[in-house]
Amino acid sequence: MVYTLNGSRDVYVGESVNLAARMRQHLAAPEKQHLDDVRVILDETFNKSVCLDLESQLIRLLAGDGKYRVLNRNDGITDSDYFDRANYRDKFDEIFEELRAANVFERPVAEIMNSDLFKLSPFKALTPDQAIAMEDILEGLFLDLETDQPSTILVQGDPGTGKTIVAIYLTKLLRDIATIPAPEDLSGDSMFAEFFAEGHRELLEDLRIALVVPQQSLRASIRQVFARTPGLSADMVLSPFQVGESTDPFDILIVDETHRLNQRANQASGVLNAKFTEINLQLFGSDDTSWTQLDWIIAQSRHQLFLLDSAQRVRPADLPTETLNGLVRSTKAKGRVYPLWSQMRVRGGADYVDYVRRILSPEPAVDISYQEFPGYEFRLYDNLLDMCQQLREKDAADGLARLVAGFAWPWRSKKNSKEYDIELDGCHLQWNRTAVDWINSRGAIDEVGSIHTVQGYDLNYAGVIIGPDLRYDPLQRKLIFDRANYHDTKGKENNPRLGIKYDDDDLLRLVSNIYGVLLTRGARGTFVYVCDPDLRNHLRQFIPV
């Protein structure tokens, strides 16, 4: 049987064959004594596998709903296939609706699954490669802690392989291991139960652990999730500057989106430029321009775990490719690199991610064959108005359908809210009005997001406008970067501190990366509109019209 146990603020979900004994255990646990409302789900057709599946689904949905704080530990949610699972899942939908009618849930399933609380929740069923990586990471980390050896760990994966989920999941798991009062309810069915055994808690309980997220918007979203998750707190989610400024070192730093850490470059404000200098002086005794935010992370922690996709560098200030390659080489030499392969976001699978990266590669496309992706809506539009209308219909039906674009138009509406930024084919559009959590903001369906508001996030459908910053030369048969039509000032800024001038080929690689990120946001589909006629004609051979 499966049960929920809740009070006014908290909820716990469990599975047991002996409910009475299980309730006695809960009543004896101080952290659950305030839970006084019990609901038991009984079905004579439910076997052990079905009960574990229902338990894990309820945990995930309750975490995403946000009405209650979920008290379950993150010791490995089950997601195993079993006989007749599809039919049992239909019964789960009925159970959910009954629980919602009883006010256990506030929102419908579709709304929950579109929320950041759900998408960024640590309560996730891991893919096999994520689970293998997690187990290997934990085994190695605990060995390092036992022997008092510093360590560097690296997780690599393409867009949609769940790097951010691994970062969040691991942070929660380490905190749970460190704070678990007693292993009274750990089960052999739990994926990571062995790490809650005696000895591991003692290695972690006094350690300072934090999650580092370079992007402002994603960092704010994760902070909201951490604030509502027992064992975690918003102040555990830091910017690289907060790490550098800390007067106390960290024991473990988990760094998401490592490719967005900065080298020494002109920052967004004079205040941040001054901070860069101050941090270098504090940590290294000099303001050598070769120091990067990667160096800050290493200097400020004994153990580091980096999550990386080098093809998602999008600005000149991001760590250079050679620095990232050096990190990969040194970590691989120690046997501490873990790849993620399974595509969790895009229904087109890993082949789709590879395909869109190749058709927009700065290298001439000479060996690419047309591919279709059954079950995934991938379409090229000749008219932006038509694409916008289709996207609105998808948003009305499924939610989370958004327009995104390269930074090929100036942000006029930032100073004058009545001005339009993008005017094409009868469409009059403005850039995103908020830089934080734009995807879920009111009116987002009427706006256009940039790389800085969507990198790291999932959409159901993405309508991608490839602007005039990217063109195609049919004579040379290659992509061309149009500097005059690229309006991200920081995206094309030279680096006089390091004596670097970025030519058009350098920026073409970054702009190609940007569109590669935008084209891999949509879980169910991606619609494409291309401004440059030659590039549009070129892409017709690769994208269905």
Regions found by a protein language model. Give the residues of each.
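Boundary/linker segments flanking structured domains
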Residues: 1, 20, 25-144
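GIY-YIG nuclease catalytic motif and its immediate N-terminal context
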Residues: 1-21
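Hydrophobic anchor at the beta1->P-loop junction of P-loop NTPases
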Residues: 155
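Conserved lysine of the Walker
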Residues: 163
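Signature of the SF2 helicase/ATPase Hel1-core->accessory helical subdomain module
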Residues: 252-337
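C-terminal accessory regions
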Residues: 303-305, 447-545
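Conserved helicase/translocase motor-coupling segment
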Residues: 315-320, 329-478
